[in-house]
Amino acid sequence: NNRSFYHNYVWTIKQPPKIIFGQNSVNQYVFPDKCLVITSKGAKSRGWLDYSGLNNKIIFDDVEPNPSIETTTKIISKFHDSDFTHIIGIGGGSSMDVAKYCAFKMNKLKIMIPTTFGSGSEVTRISVLKVDGNKKSFHDDKIFADIAIVDSYFIKNSSDEIIKNSVIDACAQATEAYDSKLANPYTKLLCENAFNILENAILNQTYEKLPLGSLMCGLGFGNSSTTLGHALSYVYSNEGYSHGHALAFTTQVAHKFNQS
């Protein structure tokens, strides 16, 4: 019953020590001098580096969608002698997952900046990478960002396809985590509110609200778990389908199967 759920249950919350949220928060942030920026090919052309003031940093801009562990090996090998203090991940979940994993292995401080709003990777202790062609999740408290900066500016240049892909991911994470056996009152509160914010933003095309929904979702599922929908989706992701595209099908199937 609810009483025993709230009173006889011990749970722990973990998240990055510092989260900065708000319009133009990235543009106003003063980044450390010695940084490695990890991102994808389009970062420069989309103006992300100009806006963030990161053009003069060391830049690796070759992160692929659904990235492989070989990409992290290449980065670690290429930059292991460099004297930077921070690794900055700027982009979608792929860029941030690579950046977090590299910083974890290289023992560098981590600053994560999402430019899509769905993965929640900026606030989780998870890095998802392909190993031998199959997606694998790495979990460790040392994978957490030291600073997450969430700025709705980046929604402006997002295509409808990227927005849909990201929002489906966030909604799937929220509904799966709400029903997770690892859920607790705090994560349920976050996931329910995240879903409502995301749904409202899509129905009313108020996309500037998506970053808040995504952030709350990341904190919610990051302290519980995704479930069957995400597990099933990796079968499609391994065949090259986008993460959101796969989840649009598998999460519904999972909820029907679980009657949740």
Question: Where do the protein language model's features map onto the residues?
Answer:
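Alpha-helix C-terminal capping segments
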Residues: 100-109, 221-224, 238-240, 256
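Glycine/threonine-rich beta-strand-loop-alpha-helix active-site module
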Residues: 69-153
